[in-house]
């Protein structure tokens, strides 16, 4: 790892992922190289089935590459056991998905505080931090509402707060506005960009929305298993 790579929040080199089913082998990703700097906001676009979600899973340590390296906050994932990888994810990364994945039996406050509780924070400190973030995303009147009592946009705002509650170095977002109408999609995306600037948390966002992607610092296209940087249409 060189000095430039040491400064990166997250980077990968020569990343590949192959899936095998019997005699059939499909190489979804090949020779993927990517580096994410502190405070940077990067969008990844590409056709359905191009491997965008697979790439995020590898970058987040949720899957293991067929070859190549992934480094998060200066640590090589290949050298960590499952417990260590889980701790690193909890400390250094936040995740936002197309489906909010909030626990239905928990309130917005409890869902948002959960990553801090898993990390060992006291209930009082976890809830204090969760309240502050929920207020920032506009949910100060929804602390005690469960996901079923929230609108789609409110659920995704709670998911954004949950992803940021541990002060991660980087947030990985997989189609975070994919289930929202245009108005809510633009509001949630703007919220994410605002928090990127305010908190200094790097963002890697997979999206099909070219209009939203164009608002980020850098747009990469996943094509034929490789990441390329091309002008937007």
Swiss-Prot record:
The gene is lolD. It comes from Nitrosococcus oceani (strain ATCC 19707 / BCRC 17464 / JCM 30415 / NCIMB 11848 / C-107). It is found in: Cell inner membrane. Pfam families: ABC_tran. One of its GO terms (molecular function) is ATP hydrolysis activity. Keywords: ATP-binding, Cell inner membrane, Cell membrane, Membrane, Nucleotide-binding, Translocase, Transport. This is Lipoprotein-releasing system ATP-binding protein LolD. GO terms for cellular component: plasma membrane. GO terms for biological process: lipoprotein localization to outer membrane; protein localization to outer membrane. ATP binds at residues 46-53. CDD domains: ABC_MJ0796_LolCDE_FtsE.
């Amino acid at each position: 790892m060189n000095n430039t790579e040491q400064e990166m929040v997250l980077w990968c080199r020569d990343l590949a992922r192959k899936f095998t089913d019997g005699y059939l082998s499909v190489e979804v990703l090949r020779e993927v190289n990517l580096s994410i700097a502190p405070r940077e906001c990067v969008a990844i676009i590409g056709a359905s089935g191009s491997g965008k979600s697979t790439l995020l899973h590898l970058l987040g340590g949720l899957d293991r590459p067929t070859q190549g390296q992934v480094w998060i906050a200066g640590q090589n994932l290949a050298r960590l056991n499952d417990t260590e990888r889980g701790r690193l994810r909890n400390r250094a990364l936040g995740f936002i998905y197309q489906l909010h994945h909030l626990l239905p039996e928990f309130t917005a406050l409890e869902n948002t505080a959960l990553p801090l509780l898993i990390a060992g924070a006291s209930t009082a400190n976890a809830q204090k931090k969760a309240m502050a973030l929920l207020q920032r995303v506009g949910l100060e009147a929804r602390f005690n509402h469960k996901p079923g009592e929230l609108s789609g946009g409110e659920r995704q705002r709670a998911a954004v707060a949950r992803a940021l509650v541990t002060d991660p170095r980087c947030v990985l977002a997989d189609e975070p506005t994919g289930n929202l109408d245009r108005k809510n999609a633009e509001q949630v995306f703007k919220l994410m960009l605002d928090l990127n600037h305010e908190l200094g948390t790097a963002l890697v966002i997979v999206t099909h929305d070219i209009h939203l992607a164009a608002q980020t610092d850098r747009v990469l296209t996943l094509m034929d298993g490789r990441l390329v940087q091309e002008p937007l249409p």
